[in-house]
């Protein structure tokens, strides 16, 4: 017996025409880790048994859940997952986002079929397929001197038995691009005091030209499983509110962020991740700070300002949204 190696794992993804029905191109996801699993719920019988044994255990619901972790880069499948997170019309996993096209958070739910292959590198390949996988959460993290990393969480409506043969075949290879780092000047945070713009030119340096050492962006679609009588499979997956939160650490060189917190003053933030070759911009035109701390942690340390924030609904022109995503904006 040869033991399977995590280094030989491959994850394929395809869009779906309906919840649980794969359709279109199949692409390879580039990941650093994954935790995609079946989640089976059971109930135990309450029958009184004089032998003190539990008489039975029955399955009552079945779904999939888990996360994929990745190093953020210019990558077509990742683009389409981002579209799904935003509730925008789902694109092709082989094409990705269209350059210089706005993606606003909306109400269209997209789903994917994901197949995980594990292998011993010799004769045994095992395949787990999860259907109706709806993007639930996103966490992007950037810290000085590191890659920009991401985690996407899924909720799925369909779990299949493990097999030794594949049901998906990649039609498009993984895009070979270099992960974005925080060393590149195109990965940055910009500030707009007016709190009503998605025009790049309106965003400038942080107040007092403060320098950020880290930032994060979190998106939560508030998904919920919709169970049903007559089947252990989910009837569907419900969407809740589109919630955007984040954090930022800056050197404590200016009073603006602190006073914005005290006065609940709204402002705009632009989180840009990229390189000289490509970039992604996340516009948050109305942000409210929910926590600010300025602490002297100890000797031989810099004084830092730790900021937590939440983005709220904004109206810019005819668009009503919380976050706008644009790739390679002109």
Language model regions located:
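Signature of extracytoplasmic/envelope-associated structural regions
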Residues: 1-330
């Amino acid at each position: 017996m040869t033991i399977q190696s995590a280094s030989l794992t491959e994850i394929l993804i395809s869009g779906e025409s309906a919840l649980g029905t794969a359709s279109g191109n199949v692409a390879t996801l580039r990941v650093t880790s994954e935790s995609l699993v079946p989640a089976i719920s059971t109930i135990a019988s309450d029958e009184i048994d004089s032998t003190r044994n539990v008489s039975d255990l029955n399955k009552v619901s079945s779904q999939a859940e888990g996360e994929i972790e990745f190093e953020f880069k210019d990558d077509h499948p990742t683009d389409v997952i981002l579209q799904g997170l935003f509730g925008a019309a789902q694109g092709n996993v082989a094409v990705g986002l269209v350059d210089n096209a706005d993606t606003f958070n909306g109400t269209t739910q997209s789903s994917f079929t994901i197949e995980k292959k594990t292998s011993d590198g010799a004769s045994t390949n095992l395949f787990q397929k999860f259907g109706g996988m709806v993007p639930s959460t996103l966490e992007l993290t950037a810290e000085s001197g590191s890659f920009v990393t991401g985690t996407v969480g899924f909720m799925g409506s369909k779990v299949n038995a493990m097999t030794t043969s594949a049901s998906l075949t990649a039609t498009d290879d993984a895009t070979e691009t270099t992960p974005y780092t925080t060393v590149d000047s195109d990965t940055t945070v910009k500030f707009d005091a007016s709190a009503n713009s998605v025009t790049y030119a309106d965003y400038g340096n942080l107040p007092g030209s403060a320098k950020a050492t880290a930032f994060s962006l979190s998106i939560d679609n508030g998904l919920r499983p919709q169970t049903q009588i007559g089947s252990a499979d989910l009837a569907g997956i419900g969407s809740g509110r589109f919630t955007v939160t984040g954090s930022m650490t800056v050197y404590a060189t200016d009073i603006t962020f602190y006073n914005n917190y005290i006065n609940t003053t709204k402002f705009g933030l632009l989180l840009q991740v990229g390189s000289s070759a490509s970039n992604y911009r996340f516009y948050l035109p109305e942000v409210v700070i929910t926590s600010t701390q300025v602490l002297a942690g100890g000797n031989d340390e810099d004084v830092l300002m730790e900021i937590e924030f939440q983005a709220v609904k904004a109206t810019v022109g005819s668009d009503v949204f919380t976050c706008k995503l644009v790739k390679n904006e002109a």
